[in-house]
Amino acid sequence: PKKLIHFMRKTVKSMLKKGTTTFVDFREGGLDGVLLMQKVLSNTPIRSIILGRIEYYQSKDQIRRNIPIPQSYQNQIDQLLKNCDGIGISGSNENSDFSLKQFSKIKKIRAIHCAETKQSYLKSKQITRKTEPKRSMLLKPDFLVHMTYASKSDLSIASKKTRGIVVCPRANASLAEGIPNVVQMMEM
C-alpha cells in the first residue's frame, strides 16, 4: 500500500494545484480502500465524496439467473457504508437485476458507471436483452457516470430518473473510448 498511498497523495496534490476543491471517488478495495483514502485525505484542504465498493462481481450465469448478493457481502456493505458517503457501482454488467435492486435500498448516494464503452453496452444487451442504462435504473442512482454510448432513449430515461450524468471527456479521450454526446444530454 505504500506505493498506492504515494500515488493517491500525489493525485490529491495535483488536484489542489489545478484548482479542484471537491472530488468524487469511486473507491475500490472495500472497507480497506475507503479507510486508506480517508488516511490519505487527512490534513488536506480538499473535500471528498467517497463512494465505496465491495469486491464482489457476479458472473454472466449469476446475472442471467438473477442471483441476489450473498448475506456475507451484505454485511460488508453495511460496514462499508458506515465509513463512506455512498456506493459507487462499477457497472450493471457485474450485477444481476436483483442485486441492483438490493443496492437501490441504500439510503446514501448511489452511483454507477454506465455505457462507458461500446463493448459494455453490447454486453448488457447480450446477457440480459436490456441496455446497460436501462438496467442501471434498477439501482435508482443519484447519477450515472460516462453514458458515452447511450442511445437517445437511454438519455431520455436518465434525464427523468436521475439527477444527472457525470461525463469524463478527458478520461475518455486518453483511453480512446469515444466522446459522449453532451449536446444531446443538455437538450434532454
Regions found by a protein language model. Give the residues of each.
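Short, intrinsically disordered, charge-balanced linker/junction segments flanking boundaries
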Residues: 1, 182-188
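Domain-level detector for long C-terminal conserved domains
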Residues: 65-66
